[in-house]
Amino acid sequence: YYTFLGKEINDFSIDANMGFNIYPFRRYRKSPISFNAHFGTNLKEPDYYQQHYYSNHYKWDNDFSKISTTTLDGTISIPHWKLNIDAGWTLIKNHIYYDGQAMAQQEASAVSVFNVSLTKNFKLWGLHFDNQALFQLSSNEDVIPLPMVAINARWYWQFNVVKKVMQMQIGANVTYNTNWYAPGYSPALGMFYNQKVEKYGNCPYIDAFVNIQWKRACIFVKFVNVGMGWPMEHADYFSAHGYIRPQRAFKLGIFWPFYMQPGRNKSVGNAGGG
């Protein structure tokens, strides 16, 4: 699109997509390898509250330039191997962020972000191993801080308690990322801001769970933060700078649709178990 008039005059957005499939598996003709690529570029006027803001705690009147963003990413999907590979590169000029005082700032120079992610799921009889790994780099950590590596693993055993009536999952969900300057949060502003006071991460966060699918009802029990920072000597489980995540706790819930939902009532779902 292109904006011809108004406050957002000269704003535009261009997107292009390309994809194709190949069929290398003779025995699995309906399971191709898919290649997809996307290119996007846009020019956008900053939001009103990035330019002007008045409150008891914050006040600013800015004259920020338009934000230019260019993105190039691609995906390789191999369903037969339960494997997905994603890679992307983003270039942002005039990026707007919030500094250590939670004041809106604009970085005039271009900042680039590169990322590669891998999703691979394994299944051995009733054992499921769902894994995701992400590697990413920011050219300017003061403006766009990122953990270099982030990992999520969901391992569980799925089995029938009563065939076609009740199914159960028992397992754990683990998240981990390397040390980084996790953003702080300003309740008065309602925004996250960059901070250089303390690094967080390098500590696994583990939830144990049990999911039960009984006909249409899904019941879950979750033991939150079962590891309490294990195996690290010092626990480090913060969702933001100064905001600690829950310590050990139990959660119990039920999801019970009172009408049929195609694709939702056939097997155990993820309604809270990870």
Label the predicted regions.
Residues Y1-G274:
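Exposed, low-structure sequence patches enriched in small/polar residues
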